[in-house]
Amino acid sequence: MDNIITNVDGVKVKVRVYDFGDEVADRYTIVYVNKNIKDGYGVVYYPVFSCSENPFHPLGVGMYAGDYYPHRSHMYNFGKRVKDIDSLPKKVIEFIKYITR
């Protein structure tokens, strides 16, 4: 279920993508699980990004949304899991490649 994508630097990275549907501006949530980062207490977390269908458009959304702590997974609602990354809009895939560099 974890999606592997090649970023703009040519490195394969693992992301999880979720979809809230078209009722919200920041429809897609991307969890960058390839980076195993620890906070000041040694707890692992993953960077989370949010974007619209066209994150590079002046009226689009494409931003860092915070951090995901796996041990607190019951506290998050990211939407429905996207199983096939290739089914995403091309601009969203481009955004994922950019943020995972």
Residue ranges and their predicted role:
Residues 88-96:
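A short, charged, amphipathic alpha-helix used as a generic interaction element across diverse proteins
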Residues 98-101:
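Short acidic DE-rich linear segments
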Residues 1-27:
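Short, charged/polar N-terminal "headpieces" of proteins
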Residues 19-86:
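Acidic, low-complexity, intrinsically disordered interaction modules
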